[in-house]
């Protein structure tokens, strides 16, 4: 499960918003919002976000067991 709080934090740190990341992973903003809500992304989407957002420790965000 994705730690959406950490992901939102990184998006904000980069000066972006969720619409920017939706474009980055080639999805509509609506689809991205739904994926954030469910906390599920496929491997291609994860790789695009890791690269595009320059995420140093992706396991901390995308393979979180505790998302509190």
What residue spans do the PLM features occupy?
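Short C-terminal boundary/hinge segments that cap the last helix of small helical domains
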Residues: 54-68
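DNA major-groove recognition helix of helix-turn-helix
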Residues: 11, 36-37
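Residues that mark the N-terminal boundary/hinge immediately upstream of a DNA-recognition element
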Residues: 6, 17, 42-45, 57
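Alpha-helical residues within the helix-turn-helix
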Residues: 12, 23, 51
């Amino acid at each position: 499960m994705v730690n959406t709080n950490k992901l939102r934090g990184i998006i904000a740190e980069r000066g972006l918003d969720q619409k920017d990341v939706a474009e980055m992973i080639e999805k509509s903003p609506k689809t991205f919002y739904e994926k954030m809500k469910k906390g599920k992304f496929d491997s291609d989407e994860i790789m695009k976000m890791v690269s595009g957002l320059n995420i140093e420790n992706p396991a901390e965000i995308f393979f979180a067991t505790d998302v509190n």
